[in-house]
Amino acid sequence: MSKSVLVAGFTTRHVAVSAAKAGYDVYAVDHFCDADLTAVVKDHMAFDELDELPFAIEEMFARHNPDFVVTTSGAELLEVPKRLGTSPSAAKRFMDKGETQKFFEEIGIPVPKELGKGQYPAMAKTLSGAGGWRNAVVRSDEELAAWHEFVQFEPYMLQEFVEGTPASVCCLATGGKAVALCTNMQILRGGDFCPYAFSGSMTPCPHPMASRMAEIAEKIAAESGCVGCMGIDFVLTDSEAYAIEINPRFQGTLETVESALG
């Protein structure tokens, strides 16, 4: 009899498809419930707002009592039974981009400098959130004010703007050790609206600094306390790999990683 897994989060398709290919009976709680998700799961439930997610998970447990639970974006901090991967207590620090910045600095990782208001150009980003869709380069107090209104006045930080190639590393971690599985070049949306939104990936990353990035990622993953598959985002220049964020869960590049690794 096949084992079963509930995949829960804002978007779950990449993990659900992988689990189905591995032979699991898959159930999903997902914001979108698009056709290529519903085609591979035994049952699914949609939600609109993230505060509805815990109740949807409870309902799926009542229906199916899955053997395991895997959380994706938006569900990293939920306390759920039978959870696989990084615990909410370990993930919590990396859900705050300011705390992630401090973590990188503490362990001596190359990272864009944090800037104060009035220092431009700067990369503005909300302290919470995923996917990069609210990130923006601002060049004046006026641009910063307009951006802050766009993100509905959420807490934010400013970083030195490093021009380079967006990339990431997929790692496997045990809570104290880690290995880099694959490097990825990220595809961002571009254009005038949400230009830094994640839109896809190419694996492996062909950039000359990819091996340097993988070495740094292994150190980050080992020090992070995370468990299982995780992703670390970077910007690559001609001379350095700058760490940007930690995703303490399966990352959006999972599909290209699996295709590249076979």
Model feature map: region roles:
Residues 1-95:
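ATP-binding N-terminal substructure of ATP-dependent carboxylate-amine bond-forming enzymes
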Residues 24, 109, 226:
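Short glycine/serine/threonine/alanine-rich loop segments
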Residues 43-47, 102-103, 140-141, 175-176:
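Short, hinge-like loop/turn segments at secondary-structure boundaries
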Residues 54-67, 71-120, 129-132, 139, ...:
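N-terminal beta-alpha lobe that positions the nucleotide/phosphoryl donor
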Residues 104, 118-138, 153-169, 181-185, ...:
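ATP-grasp fold ATP-binding core
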Residues 160-225, 236, 247-262:
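ATP-dependent carboxylate/phosphate-activation module, predominantly the ATP-grasp catalytic core
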Residues 227-233:
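Flexible, glycine/charged-enriched surface loops at secondary-structure junctions
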Residues 240-242:
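Conserved protein kinase catalytic/activation segment
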